[in-house]
């Protein structure tokens, strides 16, 4: 009876994996990473004042970056932001 439980658990976990795996590959993920352009702007943890650009879901907008931390939705120029995030 012990082997039957183990096989049942393996079968259950296999089915669970097959059902949830497509969700991991949804539109919010590209090449295994979260789509940068969907992240919110994030000033970071420091108090410097660098002008940067982020994609707000529609277009690229300026924000002040503190110089450390934050996320990858941060570009040095509007052109770089549009190149990465604007839909063709």
Curated annotation (Swiss-Prot):
Keyword Signal annotated: yes
Compartment annotation: Secreted
Alphabetized Pfam families for the sequence: Kunitz_BPTI
Disulfide bonds: 37-85, 60-81
Superkingdom as given in the UniProt entry: Eukaryota
Keyword set, alphabetical order: Disulfide bond, Protease inhibitor, Secreted, Serine protease inhibitor, Signal
Site positions for Reactive bond for trypsin: 47-48
BPTI/Kunitz inhibitor domain segment(s): 37-85
GO MF term set: potassium channel regulator activity; serine-type endopeptidase inhibitor activity; toxin activity
Residue ranges the record assigns to the propeptide: 28-33
Alphabetical list of Gene3D superfamilies matching this protein: Pancreatic trypsin inhibitor Kunitz domain
CDD domains (UniProt xref): Kunitz_huwentoxin
Name under which the protein is recorded: Kunitz-type U15-theraphotoxin-Hhn1m
Gene source species: Cyriopagopus hainanus
């Amino acid at each position: 009876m012990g082997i039957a439980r183990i096989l049942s658990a393996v079968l259950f976990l296999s089915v669970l994996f097959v059902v949830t795996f497509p969700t991991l590959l949804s539109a919010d993920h590209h090449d295994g990473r979260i789509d940068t352009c969907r992240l919110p702007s994030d000033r970071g943890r420091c108090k410097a004042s660098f002008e940067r650009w982020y994609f707000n879901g529609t277009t690229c907008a300026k924000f002040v970056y503190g110089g450390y931390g934050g996320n990858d939705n941060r570009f040095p120029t509007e052109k770089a932001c549009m190149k990465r995030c604007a839909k063709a």
